[in-house]
C-alpha cells in the first residue's frame, strides 16, 4: 500500500504543480491584458479629447470664416451700390482736383471759365476697382489675424 500511496501522492503533487503553473500563467495573462486595456483606454480618451478639440476649432474657424466672408460680401455690395449711384448720378465722387482754366477771347479780362472737374471713365473704374481690392485685402487680413490669435495659441 505504501507504493500505491506514493504513486497517488506523486500524481496529486504533479496535478497540483500543473494546476499552479496554469493558474500562474493565466494570472500573468490577466495582468498583461488589464495593463493593455488600461493603456488603450487612456489612448482612446486622449484621442477623443483631440477629436473634440479639433471639432471645436473647426466650428470656430467656420464661424470666423462666415463672419468675415459676410463682412466682405457686405463691403463689396456697398462698393457696387456706390459705383452704381455714381454712374447714375445719384451720388457724386469727390476728389481733390484742380481744373485748368479755359480763356475765351471774347470774355472780359481777368475772368476765367473753369472746366467742370470730372474723372475720366477709366480713372473712375480704376478707383472703384482699387477700393474693392483694398476692402478685400483688409477683410482677409482681419480674418487671418483673428484666426492666428484664436486658433494658433
From Swiss-Prot:
Tagged with keyword tRNA-binding: no
Effect on the protein upon substituting residue 152 to S: Complete loss of disulfide-linked homodimers
Topology, Periplasmic side: 25-153
Subcellular location: Host cell inner membrane
Pfam families the record matches: Phage_lysis
Residue ranges that the UniProt entry lists as topological domain Cytoplasmic: 1-3
Keywords assigned by UniProt, alphabetized: Coiled coil, Cytolysis, Disulfide bond, Host cell inner membrane, Host cell lysis by virus, Host cell membrane, Host membrane, Membrane, Signal-anchor, Transmembrane, Transmembrane helix, Viral release from host cell
Quaternary context: Homodimer; disulfide-linked. Interacts (via C-terminus) with the spanin outer lipoprotein subunit (via C-terminus). Part of the spanin complex which spans the entire periplasmic space. The spanin complex is composed of one homodimer of the i-spanin linked by intermolecular disulfide bonds involving two Cys residues and one homodimer of the o-spanin covalently linked by an intermolecular disulfide bond involving one Cys.
Function: Component of the spanin complex that disrupts the host outer membrane and participates in cell lysis during virus exit. The spanin complex conducts the final step in host lysis by disrupting the outer membrane after holin and endolysin have permeabilized the inner membrane and degraded the host peptidoglycans. Host outer membrane disruption is due to local fusion between the inner and outer membrane performed by the spanin complex.
Free-text domain note: The coiled coil region is probably involved in host membrane fusion leading to lysis.
Family under the similarity heading: Belongs to the Lambdavirus i-spanin family.
The protein, known as: Spanin, inner membrane subunit
Organism: Escherichia phage lambda (Bacteriophage lambda)
Amino acid at each position: 500500500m505504501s507504493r500505491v500511496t506514493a504513486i497517488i501522492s506523486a500524481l496529486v503533487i504533479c496535478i497540483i504543480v500543473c494546476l499552479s503553473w496554469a493558474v500562474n500563467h493565466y494570472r500573468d495573462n490577466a495582468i498583461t491584458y488589464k495593463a493593455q486595456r488600461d493603456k488603450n483606454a487612456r489612448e482612446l480618451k486622449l484621442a477623443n479629447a483631440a477629436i473634440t478639440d479639433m471639432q471645436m476649432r473647426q466650428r470656430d474657424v467656420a464661424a470666423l470664416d462666415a463672419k468675415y466672408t459676410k463682412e466682405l460680401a457686405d463691403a463689396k455690395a456697398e462698393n457696387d451700390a456706390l459705383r452704381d449711384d455714381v454712374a447714375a448720378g445719384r451720388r457724386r465722387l469727390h476728389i481733390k482736383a484742380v481744373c485748368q482754366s479755359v480763356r475765351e477771347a471774347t470774355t472780359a479780362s481777368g475772368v476765367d471759365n473753369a472746366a467742370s472737374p470730372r474723372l475720366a471713365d477709366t480713372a473712375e473704374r480704376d478707383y472703384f476697382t482699387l477700393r474693392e481690392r483694398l476692402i478685400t485685402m483688409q477683410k482677409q487680413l482681419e480674418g487671418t489675424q483673428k484666426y492666428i490669435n484664436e486658433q494658433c495659441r
